[in-house]
Amino acid sequence: MAHIEKQAGELQEKLIAVNRVSKTVKGGRIFSFTALTVVGDGNGRVGFGYGKAREVPAAIQKAMEKARRNMINVALNHGTLQHPVKGAHTGSRVFMQPASEGTGIIAGGAMRAVLEVAGVHNVLAKAYGSTNPINVVRATIDGLANMKSPEMVAAKRGKSVEEILG
């Protein structure tokens, strides 16, 4: 599993996985490459992309472009999560919970890359079930997208933020 990090303007880009895939035809096999990347601004915006091409650099480029187009906003709370969240995609399930200052990102592989570029600095996370990088990334982003800030919950319930936080 390759990890490449670049700064593109204000966006952090990370390469999570490159995979060689083949198509069998009458004359033999045709090989191509897939790339899984995540991009984020380190301040709550994150997206992932999956690109496929005959050459590795082209696959990475396609994945980066798709990641930039598919970004979501995540409501962070001083570098950690608002509350414990679960995310799922196909066979992968992830659980993430906020952690105190100085804990760091305790997460594995693909989940760590997503959390780093999203701007999360302290989190405890665990992946269950399938650890296929694509599914783990999708499950992580699903969990982050489902996280609600106290302001959002208060607005939905028609209460003040103080009432929500107790």
Swiss-Prot record:
Keywords of this entry: Ribonucleoprotein, Ribosomal protein, RNA-binding, rRNA-binding
Gene Ontology molecular function terms on file: rRNA binding; structural constituent of ribosome
SUPFAM superfamilies reported in the protein's UniProt record: dsRNA-binding domain-like (SSF54768), Ribosomal protein S5 domain 2-like (SSF54211)
Similarity annotation: Belongs to the universal ribosomal protein uS5 family.
Record's comment describing the protein's domains: The N-terminal domain interacts with the head of the 30S subunit; the C-terminal domain interacts with the body and contacts protein S4. The interaction surface between S4 and S5 is involved in control of translational fidelity.
Quaternary structure annotation from Swiss-Prot or TrEMBL: Part of the 30S ribosomal subunit. Contacts proteins S4 and S8.
PANTHER family listed in its UniProt record: MITOCHONDRIAL RIBOSOMAL PROTEIN S5 (PTHR48277:SF1)
Listed name of the protein: Small ribosomal subunit protein uS5
Gene source species: Cronobacter sakazakii (strain ATCC BAA-894) (Enterobacter sakazakii)
Gene that produces this protein: rpsE
